[in-house]
């Protein structure tokens, strides 16, 4: 009992020196635990006369209460300090700009397709589609390219078997459309096509768009006027345009269309011609009554010319540094 005041003072000193909650708990066990210094003081009561024990017990309990209060106060201080330190470490500078949600953008080839569809849509063309896995009839035979025709050698075709292939052109869509409906016909046919070629200006898969008109009294003049308007609208310039005689099995006469580039050189942009009478006969349309014109162009080619891209493969490499330029 004589050491009670010293024990309380010693406990309070240890409590004030505890640097964290774990150290503080060690002090609690040392003084108030089952075998703690103040707890053991209760065992000295048996040495006192019975009439003195209640008063002595009250003094010991008062000492334990003082130490418990000191423990509680110090624990609150340590927990508050720990919370403040954590908040300081996790602080947010509200003056910093927020993380902006970046909007996506259309792929440049998609932008080109949309632009062309919009232009021809205003001229009354509808969009037609067809299968990418095609048969040799729709891809070759019906287009005046029979099995013995030398033009078949010009296509590096991906064949599945002797009759099925990945289409090399979207012209098969024209055949399917003409077989399904009678003139007047006015369609454009965008889609993916496949050829076994890969270099700076060719990829095994690329996008093509073909156009077709079949009606009475359609002439080459109609074809030239349509393509003149289209190219000047697409490039947004009053371009110098020329038509060169060419050869395609499915058109007669045929032409390739060039535009004058900024470097003063002619650049080929598309092929076109009047629908060959044999093609019309193959789909049950009388070439003595109806005529038509067709044209075809590569979407990547036009996109390269419009945006000044030098390597076609850039469109398929998914490099965001490249693609973000077109947003």
Swiss-Prot record:
Keywords: Aminoacyl-tRNA synthetase, ATP-binding, Cytoplasm, Ligase, Magnesium, Metal-binding, Nucleotide-binding, Protein biosynthesis. It holds the Pfam family tRNA-synt_2d. Binds 2 magnesium ions per tetramer. PROSITE patterns: AA_TRNA_LIGASE_II. It comes from Escherichia coli (strain K12). Its EC number is 6.1.1.20. Belongs to the class-II aminoacyl-tRNA synthetase family. Phe-tRNA synthetase alpha subunit type 1 subfamily. One of its GO terms (biological process) is phenylalanyl-tRNA aminoacylation. The gene is pheS. This is Phenylalanine--tRNA ligase alpha subunit. InterPro entries: aa-tRNA-synth_II (IPR006195), aa-tRNA-synth_II/BPL/LPL (IPR045864), Phe-tRNA-synth_IIc_asu (IPR004529), Phe-tRNA_ligase_II_N (IPR004188), Phe_tRNA_ligase_alpha1_bac (IPR022911), Phenylalanyl-tRNA_Synthase (IPR002319), tRNA-bd_arm (IPR010978).
